[in-house]
């Protein structure tokens, strides 16, 4: 069975997400795997697939800042900090924001913060808009293997039955940069 999901079948992808499935999709640099951030079942599936401990925390990718607001606390950002963030968005820079106590631990891990990004990848923007919220986003690769850059690489690592949204990555060579929204500290070079 081939579970390739053509870019025109966003409704089919949303249906899979609503059923707590993990999917693969192209992002700015590599393919990502993602799921519904509000579903502990889906996130647990993603973590098991990636062999990733829950305490590391995850990244949310969204079409707009509004989609991220329920998961973060931006109230303590100064005007300058807010400008630094919004000058980079939409785009391939992930920012770590304080997280309110209501943000699930399966997203934040051992932290009181959450990494989030407003993407400029058109397919991911369309997907998040159709879904009405952000997606958990982590690189599509099994532990110890390089991140996938093509549908074929996703198939090779995850199998032919794994649902993959067809499309091209944004052409960036490195994963997104990660910075602290409050301090500007660089956690990962992009």
UniProtKB/Swiss-Prot annotation:
Catalytic activity line of the entry: L-threonine + hydrogencarbonate + ATP = L-threonylcarbamoyladenylate + diphosphate + H2O
Domain YrdC-like stretches: 7-190
Species this chain originates from: Salmonella paratyphi A (strain ATCC 9150 / SARB42)
One Gene Ontology MF term: L-threonylcarbamoyladenylate synthase
Main function: Required for the formation of a threonylcarbamoyl group on adenosine at position 37 (t(6)A37) in tRNAs that read codons beginning with adenine. Catalyzes the conversion of L-threonine, HCO(3)(-)/CO(2) and ATP to give threonylcarbamoyl-AMP (TC-AMP) as the acyladenylate intermediate, with the release of diphosphate.
Subcellular location field: Cytoplasm
Enzyme Commission number(s) from the entry: 2.7.7.87
UniProt family annotation: Belongs to the SUA5 family. TsaC subfamily.
SUPFAM superfamilies given in the database record: YrdC/RibB
Gene that specifies this protein: tsaC
Primary site of residence: cytoplasm
UniProt keyword annotations, A-Z: ATP-binding, Cytoplasm, Nucleotide-binding, Nucleotidyltransferase, Transferase, tRNA processing
PROSITE patterns attached to this UniProt entry: YRDC (PS51163)
Name of the featured protein: Threonylcarbamoyl-AMP synthase
TM region positions: none
Annotated Gene Ontology cellular component terms: cytoplasm
Pfam families: Sua5_yciO_yrdC
One BP term from GO: tRNA threonylcarbamoyladenosine modification
InterPro entries for this protein: DHBP_synth_RibB-like_a/b_dom, Sua5-like_dom, TC-AMP_synthase, TC-AMP_synthase_SUA5
The keyword Oxidoreductase is assigned to this record: no
Chain coiled-coil ranges: none
């Amino acid at each position: 069975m081939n579970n390739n999901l053509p870019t025109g079948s966003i409704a089919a992808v949303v249906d899979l997400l609503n059923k707590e499935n993990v999917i693969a999709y192209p992002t700015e640099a590599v393919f990502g795997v993602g799921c519904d951030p509000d579903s502990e079942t889906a996130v647990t599936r993603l973590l098991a697939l990636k062999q990733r401990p829950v305490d590391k925390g995850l990244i949310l990718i969204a079409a707009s800042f509004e989609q991220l607001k329920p998961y973060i606390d931006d109230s303590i950002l100064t005007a300058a900090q807010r400008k630094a963030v919004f000058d980079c968005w939409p785009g391939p820079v992930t920012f770590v924001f304080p997280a309110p106590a209501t943000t699930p631990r399966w997203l934040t891990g051992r932290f009181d913060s959450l990494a989030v990004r407003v993407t400029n990848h058109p397919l991911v923007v369309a997907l998040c808009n159709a879904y009405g919220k952000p997606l958990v986003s982590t690189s599509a690769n099994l532990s110890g293997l390089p991140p996938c850059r093509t549908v074929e690489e996703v198939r090779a690592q995850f199998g032919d039955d794994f649902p993959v949204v067809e499309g091209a990555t944004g052409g960036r060579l490195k994963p997104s940069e990660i910075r602290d929204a409050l301090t500007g500290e660089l956690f990962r070079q992009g």
